[in-house]
């Protein structure tokens, strides 16, 4: 049987459910697929299909993630749901499933709980642009004032982490009732309302091709009589022949002009996001440029050595360290295409970090890397991955 062609009629958005264990994330995921399959076509997925999520490997880390899709009036959503708390932490830090927005699920019967807070913090640290809230299990709360109180608590918690708590949409309902086909206000209409809030509140992400040109350099060749060629996959934006570009990272930033673009041995006028290209650079010697630098639009990205990061440390079972590490730990940080040694400073009050933990840390690299908030990296020891992280704040 041939795969049916994916028709891209509607803009595509990546979302995911976050929130405390047993607050109803997976039930809501199932309800979204069911209610929207009835409204706009598509497949309904049962709770147990989603809950038995297959394990995937992302950057050497095993993560259990369920992927479902559904459509609203105006959008196509790809939605991730994780069975366990550890899977969420890993997923958000590695960016294995990039989220354009998150649906925070809070049980109206319990209110915000420790993982509610932790997931909101992670969403802030890894740069999730927007959150909408589903106040679930509202059928179990008889008191309208109590519902209002829980909503206020959630809004305050979001504001604590620099989300717009006052204006974030909060939809109240029961995912289970919706899944059972209940048409009362708490049931299916609440799911429709949630999706309308997602359509309105989660912004359309910029397409990679619309960003500022950036290409991590993977290899460097010199072609006699023509000059130096750097190769790599264009991460975002477009590079046209004749345009000025900068080489950023490791050493001092240099400016040059791209005098040729080739792909599959053919000469092109331009290369764009997703293309694997070779770019010919004017006046650059083979030794002036190296793997680990980036080619980019001038002034669009700057080199840095000092940053804060949110990091997940692999457990022993995942092939990580068998022992904890301490302040002053000096592993390699693998950014895009290369390793750079760095020194770790742990937060005050944190003596050590155990395999399987996630931790906020400050890192000082021995050489600068073209960096921006949200950049992902791996932590390695002798070529073996022992952690994964994301830059949450550039310090200098």
From Swiss-Prot:
Entry keyword Protein biosynthesis: yes
Top EC class, one word: hydrolase
HAMAP family: EF_Tu_B
Enzyme Commission number(s) of this protein: 3.6.5.3
Name listed for the protein in its UniProt record: Elongation factor Tu 2
GO CC terms, sorted: cytosol
Positions of region (G4): 136-139
Region spans: G5: 174-176
Region (G1): 19-26
Superkingdom: Bacteria
Record key words, sorted: Cytoplasm, Elongation factor, GTP-binding, Hydrolase, Magnesium, Metal-binding, Nucleotide-binding, Protein biosynthesis
Stretches assigned to coiled coil: none
Localisation: Cytoplasm
Annotated spans, G3: 81-84
Species this chain originates from: Halorhodospira halophila (strain DSM 244 / SL1)
Catalytic activity: GTP + H2O = GDP + phosphate + H(+)
Record-linked Pfam families: GTP_EFTU, GTP_EFTU_D2, GTP_EFTU_D3
Gene Ontology molecular function, alphabetical: GTP binding; GTPase activity; guanosine tetraphosphate binding; translation elongation factor activity
Lineage per the UniProt record: Bacteria, Pseudomonadati, Pseudomonadota, Gammaproteobacteria, Chromatiales
């Amino acid at each position: 049987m041939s795969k049916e062609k994916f028709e891209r009629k509607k803009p595509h958005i990546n979302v995911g459910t976050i929130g405390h264990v047993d607050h109803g994330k997976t039930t809501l995921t199932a309800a979204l697929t069911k209610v929207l399959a009835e409204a706009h076509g598509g497949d309904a997925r049962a709770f147990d299909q989603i809950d038995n999520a297959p394990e995937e490997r992302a950057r050497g880390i095993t993560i259990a993630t369920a992927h479902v899709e559904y459509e609203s009036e105006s959008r196509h959503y790809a939605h991730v749901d994780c069975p366990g708390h550890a899977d969420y932490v890993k997923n958000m830090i590695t960016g294995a499933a990039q989220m354009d927005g998150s649906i925070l699920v809070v049980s109206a019967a319990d209110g915000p709980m420790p993982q509610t807070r932790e997931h909101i913090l992670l969403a802030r640290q890894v740069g999730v642009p927007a959150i909408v809230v589903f106040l679930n299990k509202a059928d179990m709360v008889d008191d309208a004032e109590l519902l209002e109180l829980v909503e206020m608590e959630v809004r305050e918690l979001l504001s604590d982490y620099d989300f717009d708590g006052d204006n974030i949409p909060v939809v109240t309902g029961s995912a289970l009732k919706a899944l059972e086909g209940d048409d009362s206000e708490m049931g299916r209409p609440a799911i429709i309302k949630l999706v309308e809030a997602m359509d309105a509140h989660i912004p359309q992400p910029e397409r990679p091709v619309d960003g500022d040109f950036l290409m991590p350099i993977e290899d460097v060749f010199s072609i006699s009589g023509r000059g130096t060629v750097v190769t790599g996959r264009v991460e975002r934006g477009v590079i046209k022949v004749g345009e000025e570009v900068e080489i950023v990272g490791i050493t001092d930033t240099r400016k040059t002009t791209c005098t040729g673009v080739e792909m599959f041995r053919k000469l092109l006028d331009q290369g764009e996001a997703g293309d694997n290209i070779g770019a010919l650079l004017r006046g650059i010697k083979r030794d002036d440029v190296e793997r680990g630098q980036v080619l980019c639009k001038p002034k669009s990205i700057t080199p840095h050595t000092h940053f804060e990061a949110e990091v997940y440390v692999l457990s022993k079972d995942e092939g990580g360290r068998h022992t904890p590490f301490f302040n002053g730990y000096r592993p390699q940080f693998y950014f895009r295409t290369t390793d750079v040694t760095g020194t770790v400073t742990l937060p005050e009050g944190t003596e050590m970090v155990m395999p399987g933990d996630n931790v906020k840390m400050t890192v000082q690299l021995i050489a600068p890397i073209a960096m921006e908030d949200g950049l992902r990296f791996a932590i390695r020891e002798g070529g073996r991955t022992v952690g994964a992280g994301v830059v949450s704040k550039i310090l200098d």
